[in-house]
């Protein structure tokens, strides 16, 4: 038997690219929508009442005043800089030399790379980002740590060594 969870609330979904056609044709907002999740994956997005009738055994969570939308995509990120978020520098070179380069060298330790990768991905998921494209460090295991952390969380990533 599959594990089913039904999220009820206003839904936002896309059937096309709103930059290539009228947004009314590409974007659908359903104020009485639902998202059926089966075994941790989105199975169906549609009318909440219809989904509830079709899946009476599903665990239901209501988001009355919330908008349920697709996961966000971050197309350019440097996960190794997670620990120095909001560090200040007068000029870019000062910031790089004072914070970035020393922090990225710390990821030469595989355990630390794993810790930072996990911390970064937990932050992204907590804020609705489900897909990322990240730079890693010059250390090959920094990419391995990110891929492993993403696999552990079921998150999609693009990164490289």
Q: What spans do the regions from the language model cover?
A:
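Gly/Ser/Thr-rich helix-start
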Residues: 47, 72, 129
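Alpha-helical scaffold segments that flank or form the walls of functional sites
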Residues: 86-155
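N-terminal metal-binding scaffold of metallo-dependent hydrolase/deaminase domains
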Residues: 1-54
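Flexible loop residues that form catalytic
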Residues: 15-16, 78, 137
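Hydrophobic faces of well-ordered beta-strands that scaffold small-molecule active sites
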Residues: 71-75, 132-134, 157-161
């Amino acid at each position: 038997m599959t594990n089913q969870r039904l999220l009820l609330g206003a839904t936002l979904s896309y059937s096309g690219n709103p930059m290539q056609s009228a947004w009314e044709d590409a974007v659908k907002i359903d104020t009485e929508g639902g998202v059926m999740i089966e075994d941790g994956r989105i199975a169906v997005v549609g009318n909440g009442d219809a989904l509830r009738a079709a899946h009476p055994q599903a665990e239901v969570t209501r988001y009355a005043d919330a908008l349920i939308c697709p996961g966000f995509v971050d197309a350019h990120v440097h996960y190794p800089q997670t620990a120095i978020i909001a560090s200040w520098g007068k000029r870019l070179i000062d910031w790089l030399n004072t914070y970035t380069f020393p922090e990225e060298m710390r990821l030469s330790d595989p355990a630390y790379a794993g810790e930072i990768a996990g911390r970064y991905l937990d932050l992204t998921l907590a804020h609705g980002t489900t897909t990322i494209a990240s730079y890693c460090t010059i250390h090959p295991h920094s990419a391995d740590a990110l891929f492993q952390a993403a696999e552990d969380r079921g998150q999609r990533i693009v990164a490289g060594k």
